[in-house]
Curated annotation (Swiss-Prot):
NCBIfam families: murC
Protein species of origin: Bacillus anthracis
Catalytic reactions of this protein: UDP-N-acetyl-alpha-D-muramate + L-alanine + ATP = UDP-N-acetyl-alpha-D-muramoyl-L-alanine + ADP + phosphate + H(+)
Keyword Ubl conjugation: no
Name used for this protein in its record: UDP-N-acetylmuramate--L-alanine ligase
Task of the protein: Cell wall formation.
Main location, first listed in the record: cytoplasm
EC id: 6.3.2.8
Example GO molecular function: UDP-N-acetylmuramate-L-alanine ligase activity
Keywords, ordered alphabetically: ATP-binding, Cell cycle, Cell division, Cell shape, Cell wall biogenesis/degradation, Cytoplasm, Ligase, Nucleotide-binding, Peptidoglycan synthesis
UniProt-listed PANTHER family: UDP-N-ACETYLMURAMATE--L-ALANINE LIGASE (PTHR43445:SF3), UDP-N-ACETYLMURAMATE--L-ALANINE LIGASE-RELATED (PTHR43445)
Biological process annotations from GO: cell division; cell wall organization; peptidoglycan biosynthetic process; regulation of cell shape
Pathway given in the UniProt record: Cell wall biogenesis; peptidoglycan biosynthesis
Subcellular location(s) of the protein: Cytoplasm
Amino acid sequence: MTVYHFVGIKGTGMSSLAQILHDMKHTVQGSDYEKRFFTQTALEKRNISILPFDKSNVKEGQVIIAGNAFPDTHEEIVAAKELNIPVHRYHHFLGDLMNQYTSVAVTGAHGKTSTTGLLAHVMQGAHPTSYLIGDGTGHGVENSKYFVFEACEYRRHFLSYNPDYAIMTNIDFDHPDYFTDINDVFSAFQEMALQVKKGIIACGDDEELQKIQAKVPVIFYGFGEDNDFQARNIQKRTDGTIFDVFVRNTYYDTFKITGYGNHSVLNALAVIALCHYENVDVEAVKHQLTTFEGVKRRFNEKPMGEQVIIDDYAHHPTEINATIEAARQKHPEREIVAVFQPHTFSRTEKFLDEFAESLSKADQVYLCDIFGSARENKGELTIEDLQKRIDGAELITDTTTDVLKKHKNGVLIFMGAGDIQKFEAAYVKEVQVAEK
């Protein structure tokens, strides 16, 4: 019996892939740091063993899948090579796996995870679909027709894939620790486009995506009249969004989604276009769009007394704009309070003015200290450099969250890609203790 051993199983992509293989009746285990990470809940539900790193975890007869964060000098990878066991890097293994299905890669600087989750949910309503989402969610179906997965542009990892279809949500400059500028990012997406086998669904409102060249048809979607799939007559309501879809200027149908903000309409439009191209029944699409409950760490909302708390992964100015816009649509009468933890010194420094501009759209801003990534843990920049660019912004720590209580009817948006949830948890605990 083959055992799939994951080196770094708590990584978001690795966790998802482990779940998929387990659901397909393979034996799966993995190792990682002992610190708890949100992805391990799904692994524990499936009784997938999570071991501390140790070279003795590696045994003959296993298939070793290694996370991208772990170098060839890692003790388990060294042990595998000593035993002549092939080591598969995560993105290469995934690239091979998807070839068994009609595969759809979802990529873009922003909106990947939400769009992947929405597409997987909609496709499941019509056909057996396996999926891998970048929030640590994976699901495998043995007789799948489709394989839907999130494909990340960082370090050009998505070039390991040759999908049947690609949805491209946007091109924007991010990951300044790797990409040099927007042209460098575009070149990565252009190279990816040439590897797609059947068709590309791209946002035509994005100036960079308009320049994409491909060997397959490129279907454009968006709000602009030049798009193949266009959203019109948009009704932004507190219970979701309704819009008409026109295909090449001919009315197609009316759709309702549970999401808020223009970005949610665009994500849905991409899914509608892909489903139209694959002849998925439109009634199934309409139904599934109304039952989508979202993905982890993307506008996850919960009431707490008179306040509303939202947890969101937004860590780029474009994403912060979208999250605040969505909150205002759903809660037009409430005060919007942003609690933001910048992620990486390089990104914060590169987009300092843009962060200030986007955060200023909230009614009040609280800033947590900068979260350094594993690749960098110090920088000359400080959180005060951002604070002084935002009128009235205050600094906050996980021991001073009680200041948030004064926003009696507020929507508190905890945003960031680091450990911002630590601050949210501290505040929830503070409120619960005060209520006793």
